[in-house]
Amino acid sequence: MTSHSVTAAAPSSTANLGPGFDIFGLAVNAFDDFVTIERSTTTNPNHSNISMREHFRTDEASFPVRIEMTGQYHESIPLEVSKNSAGLAIQKIIKDFGIKGSFSVIVKKNIPPGFGMGSSAASAAAAVMAFDTLLDLHISKPDLVRFAAEGEKASAGSLHYDNVAASILGGFVLVRPFPTVPEFIHIEPPKDLHLVFAIPGLEVPAKKTELARKVLPENVSLGHVVHNLSNAATVVAGFVLKDVNMIARGIEDIIVEPARKHLIPCFDNVRASALDAGAFAVTISGAGPSMVAIVSGEDRLEAIANSMRIGFGQCELTCTTIKCSPSKGARIVSKK
């Protein structure tokens, strides 16, 4: 039976995990974005009535995608297709497959945007999953990741695979972006891996990820590269061996983190406080400003969360903490 509406959910994620810049992604069950794709009853967005125009916009009068934003964090998300990660990802599928018709895209934005939690990636991931199911396209998971990565241009200004790969595939993902066709290697995380995210009460600029990339060094020493490669290999080995302690030993970055940590008030205080409370490792989540601590088991989670709140409090910043664990990937939640 043909569906007229499909809803998919995709989880938040953390990228880099220290030395794995643009390479490592981990899906986490802290938040989910939901995207519903509906076949429109009209063939042109300009034919919609006034009340619908208050919710929908399109870049071109002839383009068949209309976007509606709902959810806790919807207000800061652009409705224009070219500036919306879900819209861009679907636009790429439509163009590549030569799809006809018009579609409504309803994004329930539950993941705070701009805080290093894979917010734009989750919307793009859920969008491509729902669109693929609605049209019965049978797109492979790796190709869904590649389509979703188009959406990252909306927030980062260029293609990025780490967060979208994690949101679609779930678990820990290693990205090989440089072959002609990028490759995504999935590894199931240890069952005792737990995380605490500290989300500081900061105002983040538009396209924060793009700005955070501008502070990175253009040249690094061979010694620093070897150091980070060793740590990145240790992280991967830890995931393969299901050893949280080994993962934590590898979460040390001497290239990207030193360049970015000044963008996060009280970074050193928060990190030291969390380590004192029992965290195995602490690093920036993605491009920040959120920070993430990892630990084995659940016993110390609340103590670590409290320590991170205290750490940010030393800079007179409020802080929201989220205790979570690795997540499965994007999923279909309803068909109508």
Task: Label the predicted regions.
Residues 239-336:
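Glycine-rich, charge-dense phosphate/pyrophosphate-binding loop(s)
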Residues 1-2, 16, 26-29, 97, ...:
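Solvent-exposed alpha-helices and their adjacent loops that cap or buttress functional pockets
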Residues 9-11, 27, 167-169, 176, ...:
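Short beta-strand segments
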Residues 12, 30, 41, 199-204, ...:
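Glycine-rich beta-alpha junction loops
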Residues 95-182:
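Gly/Ser-rich oxyanion-binding loop with an adjacent helix/lid
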Residues 38, 166-178, 293-296, 333-335:
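Short beta-strand-to-turn element immediately C-terminal to the catalytic PLP-Schiff-base lysine
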Residues 190-272, 276-277:
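Acyltransferase
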Residues 1-115, 133-139, 169-170, 326-329, ...:
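ATP-binding N-lobe of GHMP and related small-molecule kinases
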